[in-house]
């Protein structure tokens, strides 16, 4: 009468069987124990490997059986399916690589569902956090520059008033006296003499034709704060120049 294990082996020779798990040596890499999906075991003969250290130890482990024992039905971990398990020897104890659970240590909590990946989202990993400011509008930039320029002009006028406050009116510059006195006199009287110049109205000074009284050079860059240092070379500090019609 034939052995039932031989019959099972003959039936399975024609069709490859799926391996449930295998135990191999971490030193030589040879397969020490192999269990198929149908519960059959394929174990290396002891005579071929006389120094095998797993023969006696694995027979005493719970949940792992020898060649003569029939496996009992139990829940098996899906983690052990089609995975390679490495056994390491530490003295007289045998451990599994990577802290993998034993065959009878399976719990329901061991099989956790994979996290759901949210598609359509962009995740940025960074090691520094900085405040990203919105770019300044061109109008706001020009307005800021003009505001600074007005403040600078007000400060310069205040300094001039303070410096001229203790002086007499006759000590003021000649150009300023010519630009203020005759024009104010004519405007107060309301009449302009017929022989006066229509360009300067008899004051002898007119607004600069290059800068139009802004006192800034045409070569100045309006988008930089350094343009205040570039003055118009054709007029004085008040933005006036001698009348060209009167000087002819």
Swiss-Prot record:
Segments for region (Disordered): 1-20, 150-172
Tell me what this protein is called. Answer: Glutaredoxin domain-containing cysteine-rich protein 2
Q: What PANTHER family does this protein's entry cite?
A: GLUTAREDOXIN DOMAIN-CONTAINING CYSTEINE-RICH PROTEIN 2 (PTHR46926:SF1)
Q: Which GO terms describe its biological process?
A: auditory receptor cell stereocilium organization; protein localization to organelle; sensory perception of sound
Give a yes or no for keyword Cell membrane in this entry: no
Q: What GO cellular component is one of the record's annotations?
A: stereocilium shaft
Q: What does this protein do?
A: Required for hearing. Plays a role in maintaining cochlear stereocilia bundles that are involved in sound detection. Ensures the restriction of TPRN to the basal region of stereocilia in hair cells.
What InterPro entries does the database record attribute to this sequence? GRXCR2, HSP_DnaJ_Cys-rich_dom_sf
> What family does this belong to?
Belongs to the GRXCR2 family.
Report the subcellular localization. Answer: Cell projection, Stereocilium
Q: Which disease is it linked to?
A: Deafness, autosomal recessive, 101: A form of non-syndromic deafness characterized by bilateral, moderate to severe hearing loss. Vestibular function is unaffected.
- Encoded by which gene? GRXCR2
Keyword Ligase among record annotations: no
- Mind listing the UniProt keywords for this protein, alphabetically? Cell projection, Deafness, Hearing, Non-syndromic deafness
The biased composition feature labelled Basic and acidic residues covers: 1-16, 157-172
Query: How does it associate, per the subunit comment?
Result: Interacts with TPRN; the interaction restricts TPRN to the stereocilum basal region.
Species the sequence originates in: Homo sapiens (Human)
Question: Where would you say this protein principally sits, based on its record?
Answer: other
